[in-house]
Curated annotation (Swiss-Prot):
Side of membrane Mitochondrial matrix, spans: 1-11, 87-94, 171-182, 262-269, 328-335, 401-406, 479-514
Xref: Pfam families: COX1 (PF00115)
Region forming the signal peptide: none
Record text on subunit structure and interactions: Component of the cytochrome c oxidase (complex IV, CIV), a multisubunit enzyme composed of 14 subunits. The complex is composed of a catalytic core of 3 subunits MT-CO1, MT-CO2 and MT-CO3, encoded in the mitochondrial DNA, and 11 supernumerary subunits COX4I, COX5A, COX5B, COX6A, COX6B, COX6C, COX7A, COX7B, COX7C, COX8 and NDUFA4, which are encoded in the nuclear genome.
Sites where the protein binds Fe(II)-heme a: H61, H378
Name listed for the protein in its UniProt record: Cytochrome c oxidase subunit 1
A GO CC annotation given for this chain: mitochondrial inner membrane
Annotated SUPFAM superfamilies: Cytochrome c oxidase subunit I-like
Function: Component of the cytochrome c oxidase, the last enzyme in the mitochondrial electron transport chain which drives oxidative phosphorylation. The respiratory chain contains 3 multisubunit complexes succinate dehydrogenase (complex II, CII), ubiquinol-cytochrome c oxidoreductase (cytochrome b-c1 complex, complex III, CIII) and cytochrome c oxidase (complex IV, CIV), that cooperate to transfer electrons derived from NADH and succinate to molecular oxygen, creating an electrochemical gradient over the inner membrane that drives transmembrane transport and the ATP synthase.
The organism's taxonomic lineage, starting at the top: Eukaryota, Metazoa, Chordata, Craniata, Vertebrata
Source organism of the structure: Pelomedusa subrufa (African side-necked turtle)
CDD domains from the UniProt entry: Cyt_c_Oxidase_I
Transmembrane regions listed in the UniProt entry: 12-40, 51-86, 95-117, 141-170, 183-212, 228-261, 270-286, 299-327, 336-357, 371-400, 407-433, 447-478
């Protein structure tokens, strides 16, 4: 294996593969951290020995899963691999920038892990709120390293976003209009626009935090005329679009899979799906303060953010019903990717419903910073984003490698994972309603039952993660041959061979409508 091929690659397929491998490793680190959290919370009493250590693990778990697992896999992995193939482009618009976007991530991950390893670690939560993140409450270099890590990961994402936007706008095959693009390409385009608009705001916020910590500025320090609430506004103006960045590519993946395994040529309501994603992207920018209902906003502001947040349920509902309409009347092929897609639709909807509950500012005053919120966002992330990743991975693995995954093992894996994540996160709704707060390593005895059930679920999920590594090994070592792909006319990525040649196009492409 040529080292130069992987270090200096300008090939979208190789870089996509690097992203997928990196994301898989980061996912295992993130899973290990989550198991430490659940082991600590299995029973009352201390296991890790200090709340600071516990919060360092929680913070690292969040950052690793968001910035080094979900984003690299969905946007970097699936995006790089599939977008050029789906629009008939020979590669990405800026191939070397593409390589740099990837290679900014390993140093970023290293800095993030270093921030946990030195001093007492960055135990701030993934929101990094001052004054807890100030140089008084967090002396030492931990938070500074975490900030630098975020700068690198953010730079990587911004460069990647520029690359995707340019590629999609300029490199489509000549007679392909925007409304001819597959939904996954649309989802990546909208995600890239969200990244480009939101990440600079995060960069500004954490840079001000960095200067507050090291250069005696007082952006977030009331004693010098600053305001810690300003940081919250800056963070969540990034943070809310970020959660849509995490789920939008998943919407695109699920749209493809649902159509494919229902034996349909295309998803139901294509234009509606495009507008729904666009609306979600737009609305995602004007609801950020629903994360801040407890900081003391006046009633008009709370009424606006409650209403605006609930409006997002409309385009989301459009998407869910369009997926169901796509399945309706189709000849369903019950293969693993379709099981993941069904799981996604059901569990993402459950997560969305708890989101509607939390959108009510009056209810959120009570539920804010309880396990109800943890349950909500893990339903949309651990069972939304991750299920979409698994659906995409089991569907396109053959395209990426040329080898099909084992049909039975992948279904067993889905079942194990489905039971594991639901057992982990469903009880957390009850804990939240009973008032158990987030980010504490210990709790009163009354919460023991649901916590121990939740921790048991996390062990089942671990079994599923281990099973996944076995399934990949089994496929790579068995080297089964591939069968022909159906619906070739509307699933362009399969038209090139499995796996496709290193350089897809030797001449200009042309779109022929079926």
């Amino acid at each position: 294996m040529n080292l130069n091929r992987w270090l200096f690659s300008t090939n979208h397929k190789d870089i996509g593969t690097l992203y997928l491998i990196f994301g898989a490793w980061a996912g295992m680190i993130g899973t290990a951290l989550s198991l430490l959290i659940r082991t600590e919370l299995n029973q009352p009493g201390n296991l890790l020995g200090s709340d600071q250590t516990y919060n360092v693990i929680v913070t690292a778990h969040a950052f690793v899963m968001i910035f080094f697992m979900v984003m690299p896999v969905m946007i970097g992995g699936f995006g790089n691999w599939l977008v050029p193939l789906m629009i008939g482009a020979p590669d990405m618009a800026f191939p070397r920038l593409n390589n740099m976007s990837f290679w900014l991530l390993p140093p970023s991950l290293l800095l993030m892990l270093a921030s946990s390893a030195i001093e007492a670690g960055a135990g701030t939560g993934w929101t990094v709120y001052p004054p807890l993140a100030s140089n008084l409450a967090h002396a030492g270099a931990s938070v500074d390293l975490a900030i630098f890590s975020l700068h690198l990961a953010g730079a990587s994402s911004i460069l990647g976003a520029i690359n995707f936007i340019t590629t999609v706008i300029n490199m489509k095959t000549p007679n392909m209009s925007f409304l001819d693009m597959p939904l996954f390409v649309w989802s990546v385009l909208i995600t890239a626009i969200l990244l480009l608009l939101s990440l600079p705001v995060l960069a500004a916020g954490i840079t001000m935090l960095l200067t507050d910590r090291n250069l005696n500025t007082t952006f977030f320090d009331p004693s010098g005329g600053g305001d810690p609430i300003l940081y919250q506004h800056l963070f969540w103006f990034f943070g809310h679009p970020e959660v849509y960045i995490l789920i939008l590519p998943g919407f695109g993946i699920i749209s493809h899979i649902v159509a494919y395994y229902s034996t349909k040529k295309e998803p139901f309501g294509y234009i509606g799906m495009v507008w729904a994603m666009t609306s979600i992207g737009f609305l995602g920018f004007i609801v950020w303060a629903h994360h801040m209902f407890t900081v003391g906003m006046n009633v008009n502001t709370r009424a606006y953010f409650t209403s605006a947040t609930m409006i997002i349920a409309i385009p989301t509902g459009v998407k869910v019903f369009n997926w169901l309409a796509t399945i309706h009347g189709g000849l369903i092929k019950w293969e693993a990717p379709m099981l993941w897609a069904f799981g996604f639709i059901f569990l993402f909807t459950v997560g969305g419903l708890t989101g509607i509950v939390l959108a009510n500012s009056s209810l959120d005053i009570v539920l804010h910073d309880t396990y109800y919120v943890v349950a909500h966002f893990h339903y949309v992330l651990s069972m939304g984003a991750v299920f979409a990743i698994m659906a995409g991975f089991t569907h396109w693995f053959t395209l990426f490698t040329g080898y099909p995954l084992h049909s039975t093992w992948t279904k067993i894996h889905f079942t194990t994972m489905f039971i594991g994540v639901n057992l982990t996160f469903f009880p957390q709704h009850f804990l939240g309603l009973a008032g158990m707060p987030r980010r504490y390593s210990d709790y009163p005895d009354a919460y023991t039952l649901w916590n121990s059930i939740s921790s048991m679920g996390s062990m089942i999920s671990l079994t599923a993660v281990v099973m996944m590594t076995f399934i990949i090994w089994e496929a790579m070592s068995s080297k089964r041959s591939t069968t022909t792909t159906e619906q070739m006319s509307t699933n362009v990525e399969w038209t090139y061979l499995c796996p496709p040649p290193n350089h897809t196009h030797v001449e200009a492409t042309h779109l022929i409508r079926p």
